[in-house]
């Protein structure tokens, strides 16, 4: 009887350990899948400048420039630029932050006749965007590590022919994600945005700019633009994640 109890306890312990290990393995794989999906999502949206041309015309950014442009004494007459010029400038910023900050100092804005008016960015703005470029460089390195880990786990899971968690388990995971998003909304997206800046960027480096003093903030209507971008990246990443998991399930079913 004693031996049976000991064997049962050992068997239960092995089962619990195995179940816990599989659960942790799936959590890690799903997190890596999301990181890979976010990386792909960023790369895709960057190709179209994060929909800035559409947002400029439909999200109040053109009106923001028309109102605050005449009030900016540091970089005047930005309201005289055309929509195409603003798109060119935003594209230049997107390219620069993805290329180690190269070209930020030389960006110039022109009026409707093509006459140069002034350089776009002040020194504090250049420093901030250089910080953004440095951050992106680190995130790219992290994304490569995540991709490598994801591929290794994918191969391992395929070799062991492990099926995906049940829809109920995935739903619980999505519910957890929804709770996090809900907390962000309750606490205030703007407050969270500002707090992240304090954590991420070097102390003493300016990252908050008033519209009347910054063409960068004015043309982006910060932080509104970043909220739109966050939604686009998240939704696209979720769709890509679902596609990757569906592909995994298809590969497992054919083995």
Task: List each language-model region with its residue ranges.
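Juxtamembrane interface at the cytosolic side of transmembrane helices
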Residues: 16, 20, 146-193, 242-255
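Individual transmembrane alpha-helix segments
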Residues: 91-145, 222-233
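Hydrophobic secretory-pathway targeting helix
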Residues: 2-52
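Juxtamembrane non-transmembrane segments of integral membrane proteins
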Residues: 38, 43-90
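Juxtamembrane non-transmembrane "cap" segments at the membrane-aqueous interface
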Residues: 187-211
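Membrane-proximal low-complexity regions enriched in glycine and acidic/polar residues
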Residues: 50-57, 135-162
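Hydrophobic alpha-helical transmembrane segments
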Residues: 77-89, 114-124, 169-187
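Terminal transmembrane helical module of multi-pass membrane proteins
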Residues: 204-255
